[in-house]
């Protein structure tokens, strides 16, 4: 049974999607309908990719990028997004990203950021009862990396040391030969995140920096995770021992809001949230802390990301 758990596929707790009939009542095929829906869904992402390609690959774009990636511009944008003046943006954002507001605790919002940080209904992100389950702290696209003996890992064509990620904190040594899990959140993802286990947490450490996008187009050109502003927390967890969680800001994300200072925490409880934009969460686990499916690392090595939801089972604590 344990072997079955170990080899379980990431995504096992996601709700299954029912297949549509092959032929619709009006004679059209369900496959064609799904294709049109996918095409419509991909259009906003394609528009964003085109804009970012211009910003990172052209001289005028890089001039604009220098202004947009600064914290001063992000703070100005944040003030607007917090104000009632931003409310007209909500309807288009919801429609463009196919967000079902019925999945959330509120359907009316005071500002754009109020909508962006909307709280989801508990039943939409159930937390598994198995105390050994390693869960995703957030919605997003997951990549998994093994940390080499030299505390270095290749993430999206850039090499990072754990020490650099943590601003030189000596705790980096605890993750020698461990695992690094990177969760990339897009604008259409749920932007609140939770604790992965019961335990105690230390203080929140903020490291100032810039605010580049966390999309692959930037990750392949700039060492984003050590350039961007970020905040990390060291947690002593019941099932996995010491775990460090890093929240990384991104383009136009000027605020990372963590709720607790040093405290006892519980798995599934809300840890914090990002304000407007895409963003990233990085989890560092020590060697042997958890058993994760090899398929996850193989998929990452092929340059593919795995969509996950907050509370989804990724693996299990290593049985001693």
Predicted regions and their residues:
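Contiguous, well-folded functional domains in the mature portion of proteins
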Residues: 2-11, 16-320
């Amino acid at each position: 049974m344990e072997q079955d758990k170990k080899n379980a596929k990431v995504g096992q707790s996601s709700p299954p999607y029912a297949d549509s009939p092959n032929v619709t009542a009006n004679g059209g095929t369900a496959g064609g309908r799904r294709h049109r829906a996918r095409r419509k869904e991909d259009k906003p992402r394609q528009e964003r990719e085109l804009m970012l390609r211009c910003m990172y690959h052209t001289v005028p774009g890089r001039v604009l990028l220098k202004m947009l990636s600064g914290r001063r511009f992000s703070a100005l944008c944040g003030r607007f997004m917090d104000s009632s003046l931003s409310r007209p943006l909500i309807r288009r954002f919801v429609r463009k990203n196919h967000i079902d507001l019925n999945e959330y605790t509120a359907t009316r919002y005071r500002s754009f950021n109020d909508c962006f940080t909307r709280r989801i209904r508990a039943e939409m992100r159930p937390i598994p009862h198995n105390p050994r389950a390693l869960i995703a702290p957030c919605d997003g696209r997951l990549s998994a990396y093994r940390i080499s003996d030299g505390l270095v890992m290749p993430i999206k064509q850039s090499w990072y040391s754990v020490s650099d990620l943590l601003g030189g904190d000596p705790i980096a040594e605890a993750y020698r030969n461990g695992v690094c899990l990177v969760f990339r959140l897009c604008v259409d993802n749920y932007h609140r995140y939770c604790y992965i286990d019961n335990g105690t947490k230390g203080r929140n450490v903020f490291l100032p920096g810039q605010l580049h996008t966390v999309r692959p187009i930037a990750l392949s050109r700039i060492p984003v995770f050590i350039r961007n502003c970020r905040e990390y927390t060291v947690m002593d967890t019941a099932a996995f021992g010491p775990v460090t969680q890093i929240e990384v800001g991104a383009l136009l994300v000027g605020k990372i809001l963590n709720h607790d200072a040093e405290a006892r925490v519980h798995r599934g409880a809300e840890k914090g949230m990002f304000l407007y934009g895409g963003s990233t969460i990085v989890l560092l686990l020590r060697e042997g802390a958890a058993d994760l499916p090899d398929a996850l690392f193989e998929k990452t090595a092929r340059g593919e990301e795995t969509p996950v939801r907050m509370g989804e089972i990724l693996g299990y604590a290593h049985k001693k």
